[in-house]
Amino acid sequence: MDYYDRIRELTKNVPVELVDFEQPRDLARTPTQASSNFITNKEQGDWAEDLVTRAINENSKNFVAVKYGKSDNLVAGENGFDTFYQDFQTELDTIGKRPDLLIFKKTDFDTTLGFDVSQIPHHQITDYVKKAIAGIEVRSSAFLIDKYEEAMQVRTQRFTEIAFQTRDKILAEFLDVLDHPSRSKYITLLNTLTLETISIFDFKVPGWRSNERLIEVNNLFKRLKVAIKEIQKRDYLSITPKVEDIKVVYKWIETFNVPHFYFQVFFDKVYGISFEQILTIISNSDNDGVIFSVEKDVQNQNKTTIKINSKTGYPIASKVDEPTHESIRKEMDRGRLLFYVTFKGGTAYLDLDNLRTILGIEEAEF
């Protein structure tokens, strides 16, 4: 069974409530206006792509990373953007979504096309693309993952202590208030709160206000509710494939039969995961809420995004030197000004063993 056949079989296991491969993709509306935040995110994504490209090309003797993903410096509201965007939508339906990078063996690398084939019409490079050994979609995240995880551990510990201290205070000081037929169920409820159940624990705050003692215990239940909500928040940073992209990535694999991967670039590390593993993870409902969640991403135009725990993937770079950055002024139509941030430089220190493993490259070859 070749790569495409394996992926096709995996798509049959993905819940249709998440991705229905039998239905055509939803048509996208052309954006009408860009924002400073959108352009900054785009610049950050371009930097992350360049970071991975340079890291591979500077460390590999036998492989080359080539820019491939459809992109343009135009943004919504500028002349020519509507045409670019509609051409992009047509290409999505024709060949699928180009990954940002292609990895070629140097023996297959076309020096006349060079390191950037992103502007070449797809029908002119079909056979060339099929020679690639991998396609990589590069995602970026404006976090330091190590510091984030440290902060989440501190947060979880703090609110766990608050939750159990509050529970104990209620049971120790307000048992007389709760020992009433209409309120005794809260005693049973509090006794079921343990380290094992706190991640799924939920209750409705009573709303008692008829006397001072009831108001006091009601406020303690409010504090307990807040602490539990904090504990139950997602506490990991993610590899972030958009739900709308799953179909068009599959279409690209169907067209070219080239293995596809997602690399998530943080400002201190890079993690990678295969599209094959993504489909395997989201096909298992037992993983939902444990190693992945499905959320509306406010940082990405509120698009529905699959958020997979980064630690599920491979650490591709164990360290990243941060880029330099500067503010840019951009004048739009009618004199509207946008100010955004650009990123330059930086270095990703690759874990070559993990990179070879995820891409399926023998050590002697790399």
UniProtKB/Swiss-Prot annotation:
Keywords: Endonuclease, Hydrolase, Nuclease, Restriction system
Transmembrane regions listed in the UniProt entry: none
Keyword set includes Hydrolase: yes
Enzymatic reactions: Endonucleolytic cleavage of DNA to give specific double-stranded fragments with terminal 5'-phosphates
UniProt EC number: 3.1.21.4
Top EC class of this enzyme: hydrolase
InterPro entries membership: Restrct_endonuc_II_AccI (IPR019054)
The keyword Mitochondrion belongs to this UniProt entry's keyword annotation: no
Gene Ontology biological process terms from the UniProt entry: DNA restriction-modification system
Example GO molecular function: type II site-specific deoxyribonuclease activity
Subunit comment: Homotetramer.
UniProt name for this protein: Type II restriction enzyme AccI
Native source organism of the sequence: Acinetobacter calcoaceticus
Gene (name only): accIR
